[in-house]
Amino acid sequence: VPGVNILHSKDLVNWEQISYCFDRFDFNDPAFSLVGGKEVYGQGVWAPCIRYNKGKFYVFTNVNGKGLQAYIADDIRGPWKHVMVKGNIYDLSILFDDDKIYAIHGYGSVRCCELKPDLSEPVPGTDREIIPEGTGVGEGHHMYKINGMYYLISTDYKPNGRTLCSRSKSIWGPYETITITADETYGYHPGPMTEVKGRIVDNGTHIKIKMPNHNATACTNAHQGGIVSTPDGQWWALLMQDFHSIGRTVDLMPITWKDGWPFIGLEGNLGRAPRTWEKPSTGAKVEPRAPYQRNDDFNGKTLQRIWQWNHNPDDKLWSLKGGKLRIESMPASQLLWARNTLTQRAIGPVSQTIVELDINNLKDGDVAGLGNINMPCSWLGVVKNGKSIKLQWFQQVDNDTITIDINPKKGKLWLMLDGDYDNDCAQYKYSLNGSDFIPAGNKITLSYQLITFQGSRPCLFAFNSKGKRGGYALFDNFKVIEPKADRSQNIPWGKTIRIINLATNLPAEATRHGVLYDTSRGNNRPSTHFRLIDTGNGKLIVQCADGRYIMASGIGMPGDVRMTNDEAQAEVFMYQDYLDHEFMLMSYNRHTYLCKSPTTGSPYSVDCKGPDPARKNGSVFKWEVVE
């Protein structure tokens, strides 16, 4: 909490966080406050649905064990009125249609019912099955009425994630169903997964982290979300994908209508979507911006909006005073049971989370520091036993603890969580002067799990391990450093490069015969040297050092990628940035990718639909500057 995050955008690319639907759970249940040995990790807000109708905003969501909740506001910034909706309705979509309110829900067997105007409960006798089990339809429904037809966007995760569309002339059916996107992982494989029985993971519990199959898609496919139209008639999808230990992320994907179906992707490559494409044409001129203000010096009267507590906080035991965040310690056996733990989602692909910690007011048994709320959890903090002050590193997988002697000046030190979320690992560090950081403990493996479904969440915490109320910790100057946020230098404009295929680790060569092929790693002739020439708006052509250009003929099969002396015949590509010098080249007009099979011995083609999860199907490259 706060819960149900509301963001706003005028261009579907640059978003601003503007409100939450509620500040705290208002159920009379101690579990939502982490009291009495009860907890609700991962049991809060599920699958929200936002709608606008007749001047009001509506958000519908499920809370496990509490049923369907509705939040209503005249202004998207709030305040929001809370209504509890009776009935067994979950993972729903809402459709306002002809003065009626329909709720569509269920997995496999999809049901629809009409809700009463006050949203108190379904209209008796209206609940019925509209899509039977056995049609391949899953859950996560989004219902739309477009040009008189009813379209239901849904997802399935058995055996892997994909997005489906069902359509009918009547909301009650019958429906026909097709897949509108599958296998679009953007070249990302699944990450490590925590395998553990039960709910909250207590210290000493046997925890297994299953390492991923790099060739599988699993739920790294873009697979669940909704669609939206722009004022000029473009259609776009916003779908989520499971993205390693970072948790679930949102993809913006173009839609192409064909035969009355909203396929994800572009006309020449339906079902797959580009990693980089032209912005939606909404007519709004918006400067690039980050959706969240992650840094917090705690000088304000309120916390930055991005912060969320792990459960309902005890507001009497935390405060903002003197430009610092004060968290008073309460009894807890370990981090996951610690109340008033303040968290925000980790940001990838790499980031360093740093905070300044004042330990002068800790008491016997207090533990305070910087951690990662996940299962398993980890932390680096100061432990006070009697008059002894030690720095302690802890990771829950092996119940490992490492203690470090420290002598912080004026009772102040700095803690860092240095996370590499692309490679699912992190290193804790500490500093006694705020600038020179020393590794603490071992590098830890970061994982994803299906208890909270949220991935890694850096957190600030203070608790007492000896079962009593303790002192308090003061936190200051929280900041998140994102070394790869500036992508302006990622495309090697003005550089002479070699194009190395990740599948074979071999460079491309413009052969004398006129086709593009691979060559030995040691071949550094000019025929292996290329320049990317900017033609505007993310588009480019590729020129060899001998003056020829890459072109594509026919339907782009192997051998159709050739060399030409005529710049006007050069194939126009759109650069697909994968960071760390890795990239793809998508034909701007064909919507398929430059590729060379790593196994057949064929020359280059431009007919690849997209990368595989391991980036080893011959469509992903790495550029090297020619010295």
Residue ranges and their predicted role:
Residues 1-490, 527-531, 570-572:
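Carbohydrate-active catalytic/glycan-binding domains of CAZyme proteins
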Residues 487-627:
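Lectin-like carbohydrate-binding module/patch detector with strong preference for beta-trefoil
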